[in-house]
Amino acid sequence: MTNHEQDQQDNSELLDDDQVTLESQQAADSGAEAPASDDVAALQAEIARLNEELQTTKENALRAAAEAQNARRRAEQDVEKAHKFGLEKFVGDILPVADNLERAIDAAKAEGADLGVVVEGVELTLKTLVDGLKRHKVEQIDPQGEPFDPQLHQAMTMIEQPDVEPNTVINVFQRGYTLHGRLVRPAMVVVSKA
C-alpha cells in the first residue's frame, strides 16, 4: 500500500468515525429534544390552566365587589328611608291632637261658648297627646311632691317650706320628658330649702 492509499484509508476511517460521532450526537440531540418538547407542551398546558384559573378568580373578585357595592347601596337606601319615614307612626299619632286643638279653638271663638266645654276639650286633647307619646316610649316626668333629682329635674328656685321635707319638689313649672329612658328635657321645678 502506498502512502497515498494509506492516507485515504485513514481519512476514510476518520470520516466514518466522525460520521458515527455526528450521528450519535444527532441521535442524542433528538432524544433530548423529544423530552424538551414534552416539557414545553406540559408547561404550556400548565400556563393555559393557570391563565384560566386567574381569569375565573378575577371574575369572582369583580362579582364579589359588585355584590358588596349593591349591598352598601341597599343599606344606604334603607337608612335614608328610615330617616325619612321613621317618624311616620309618630306623626300619625300626633295629627289627631292638631285636629282636636283646631276644634277647641273653633269652639272657643263661637259666640256664647261654654268655657267649661272648651277646657274639657283641651284636657282630652292633652290626654290624646300624652297617650300618643307613650306609645312611642316618650314618658312624662311630673315630680310634684317627690325628692329633687338633679339627673331628671332642673331647680328654677328654692323656697322655704317648713311643712315640707327639704329638697322636695313643691311646684312644677314645666314637665320633663324621657325617650326610652333617656332624658330629653328635665322637669323645671321649685324645690323646698333645707
UniProtKB/Swiss-Prot annotation:
Coiled coil: none
Main location: cytoplasm
CDD domains on file: GrpE
GO BP: protein folding
Residue ranges with Acidic residues bias: 8-20
Region (Disordered), start-end ranges: 1-39
CC per GO annotation: cytosol
Subcellular location: Cytoplasm
GO molecular function per UniProt: adenyl-nucleotide exchange factor activity; protein homodimerization activity; protein-folding chaperone binding; unfolded protein binding
Record's keyword terms, sorted: Chaperone, Cytoplasm, Stress response
InterPro entries per the UniProt record, alphabetical: GrpE, GrpE_coiled_coil, GrpE_head
HAMAP family listed in its UniProt record: GrpE (MF_01151)
Role description: Participates actively in the response to hyperosmotic and heat shock by preventing the aggregation of stress-denatured proteins, in association with DnaK and GrpE. It is the nucleotide exchange factor for DnaK and may function as a thermosensor. Unfolded proteins bind initially to DnaJ; upon interaction with the DnaJ-bound protein, DnaK hydrolyzes its bound ATP, resulting in the formation of a stable complex. GrpE releases ADP from DnaK; ATP binding to DnaK triggers the release of the substrate protein, thus completing the reaction cycle.
Assembly notes: Homodimer.
PANTHER family: GRPE PROTEIN, GRPE PROTEIN HOMOLOG, MITOCHONDRIAL
Similarity section: Belongs to the GrpE family.
Name the UniProt record assigns to this protein: Protein GrpE
Organism: Saccharophagus degradans (strain 2-40 / ATCC 43961 / DSM 17024)
